[in-house]
Design a protein with these regions (language model features):
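Extracytoplasmic electrostatic interaction patches
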Residues: 107, 132-135, 150-154
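Short coil turns that connect the paired helices of HEAT/ARM alpha-solenoid repeats
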Residues: 44-48, 79-84, 118-126, 151-158
Length: 172
C-alpha cells in the first residue's frame, strides 16, 4: 500500500511540474510550501523529470529560500544518501553552474562534517568518501585537493587518513 502511495506521489509531482511550467506564481507557491525533507524525497525519486525540475528552479534564482533548500538537499543527499540518492544528486548538481554551486558547497560541506558527530568511524568514513566523490565527479579539483590535504590528511580517525593515501595513490 505504501509503495502505491509513493508512485501516485511521483505521478502527481510530475503532473504538477507540467501544469506549473508556465505559471511561475503557482510553481513558486508549490515549492515554497515544501520542507527540506520533501525536497530530499522529491529529488531522490528516479521517475521524476529531474532536469525539468532543475530548469524550473533556475526561474527562481532570486527566491533564495527555495534555492537554499534545493542546494542543501542535493548536497546533503550526495554526501549522506543511499547509493541511488548519491548518483541522482550528483547528476543534478552537474547541471548547476559552478559559480552558483561553489559558495554553497563551501558553506554546506563543513556543516555536514560537523553534523556527523557519531562515534561510528565507518559512518564518518562513508560520508568523507562521498564528499571526495562529489568533488571529483563535479570536476572541482581545487576543492577536492583542499579537502584531501586539509581535512583527511591529518584526521584522528585512521580510516579517514587512509582516504588521503587512497586518493593520492589513485591520482598518480
Amino acid at each position: 500500500m505504501e509503495e502505491k502511495k509513493v508512485i501516485n506521489n511521483i505521478y502527481e509531482i510530475n503532473s504538477i511540474l507540467t501544469k506549473f511550467q508556465n505559471d511561475k506564481k503557482k510553481y513558486f507557491y508549490f515549492l515554497e510550501r515544501m520542507d527540506e525533507k520533501e525536497f530530499f524525497s522529491l529529488l531522490s525519486k528516479r521517475k521524476i523529470d529531474s532536469l525539468r525540475f532543475v530548469n524550473l528552479l533556475f526561474l527562481f534564482a532570486n527566491y533564495t529560500l527555495i534555492i537554499e533548500k534545493f542546494y542543501y538537499s542535493l548536497i546533503y543527499l550526495a554526501t549522506v544518501g543511499t547509493e541511488s540518492e548519491v548518483i541522482n544528486s550528483i547528476y543534478l548538481l552537474k547541471n548547476i553552474p559552478y559559480e552558483w554551486l561553489r559558495d554553497k558547497l563551501k558553506e554546506v560541506i563543513p556543516e555536514i562534517v560537523e553534523l556527523i558527530r557519531s562515534e561510528d568511524e565507518e559512518e564518518k568514513h562513508y560520508v568523507y568518501n562521498k564528499i571526495l566523490s562529489l568533488y571529483y565527479f563535479l570536476g572541482y579539483k581545487e576543492e577536492l585537493d583542499d579537502f584531501i590535504n586539509n581535512i583527511c590528511k591529518g584526521h584522528q580517525i585512521e580510516l579517514i587518513r587512509e582516504l588521503y593515501d587512497d586518493w593520492k595513490d589513485w591520482k598518480k
